[in-house]
Design a protein with these regions (language model features):
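Short, glycine-anchored, charge-dense loop/turn motifs used at functional sites
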Residues: 74-81, 193-203
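N-terminal beta-strand motif that seeds the catalytic metal site of vicinal oxygen chelate
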Residues: 33, 56-62, 80-111, 115-129, ...
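Vicinal oxygen chelate
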Residues: 3-13, 26-50, 93-102, 133-138, ...
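Extended, hydrophobic interaction surfaces within ordered domains
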Residues: 2, 26, 32-86, 207, ...
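Short, small/polar residue-rich loop motifs at catalytic or cofactor-binding pockets
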Residues: 4, 65-68, 130-131, 185-187
Length: 245
């Protein structure tokens, strides 16, 4: 409806989030969770209390061997959070769980994503059968964690959690689009699903300026043009914004 909030961008502990009003079709799952590294126990208890309120406890907040004080919960909106004591300032790091058909493919995914986006692997903890119990990596300077889970789970990746990066021009958008949708799937409005089922988006500063312009009529034209396409075409959206298409 006109006047309803569609998107909002916020920063939590140095991690940028873009929230979308996507409707009931977008249901989050623990396949992607967010690891909150807290500065001290007081902060940890407060964060846990807020996130766990009216939520679903997956692992109670307590002391675990090798993990220390740790808890895992789905908040009241269904988003999944791992809360633990960190060593420095509070941080939030996305965590990707590879289970079921993806079990054992975490290292391959890291290698592919680094080849596409640029980055590096930061740590490796091996588990059973030489799988990745946990591994840290960076994509374009952003920290992520991935783990192979041997357990059978009923959940998988959904569009409720996706990763997005800003790209400066159409050439970069095209390269990433072709790489991620190869053996994957194309979705409307610049969304991509890779061959592991993880969802990605390509964003551009100009695109955001057009679709969020204070000139509501121009913004509407740009947004409607974007809704018509799968891969983002900056030139076509700009023409719609300028009224020249």
């Amino acid at each position: 409806e006109i006047g309803d909030l569609l998107t909002i961008t916020l920063e939590l502990a140095g991690c940028e989030f873009l929230l979308l009003n996507g409707g009931d079709d977008f249901s989050p799952s623990p396949a992607i969770s967010y690891v909150v590294n807290c500065e001290n126990e007081e902060q940890l208890l407060n964060v846990w209390k807020q996130l766990n309120h009216d939520g679903e406890t997956l692992m109670p907040l307590t002391d675990y061997p090798e993990l220390g004080k740790f808890g895992w919960t789905n908040d009241r909106y269904g988003f999944s959070w791992q809360v633990r004591l960190g060593e420095n300032l509070q941080t939030i790091i996305p965590c990707i769980m590879f289970a079921n058909n993806n079990y054992g493919l975490a290292q391959a995914a890291i290698d592919e994503w680094i080849a596409i986006f640029g980055g590096k692997q930061t740590f490796v903890i091996k588990g059973k059968e030489d799988r990745l119990r946990a591994s840290g990596f960076q994509l374009r300077g952003h920290d992520l964690i991935i783990m192979d889970s041997p357990e059978k789970h009923t959940f998988t990746f959904t569009m409720a959690n996706s990763f997005y990066f800003y790209f400066k021009d159409q050439t970069d958008i095209d390269k990433v689009w072709e790489a991620l949708t190869y053996d994957g799937k194309e979705w409307p409005c610049g969304w991509m699903e890779d061959r592991y089922g993880v969802f990605w988006q390509t964003l551009n500063k100009d695109l955001l300026n057009w679709t969020n312009s204070s000139d509501s009529e121009k913004a509407r034209h740009a947004t409607q043009e974007m809704y018509k396409m799968k891969k983002i075409n900056l030139a076509q959206i700009k023409q719609a914004f300028d009224g020249t298409n």
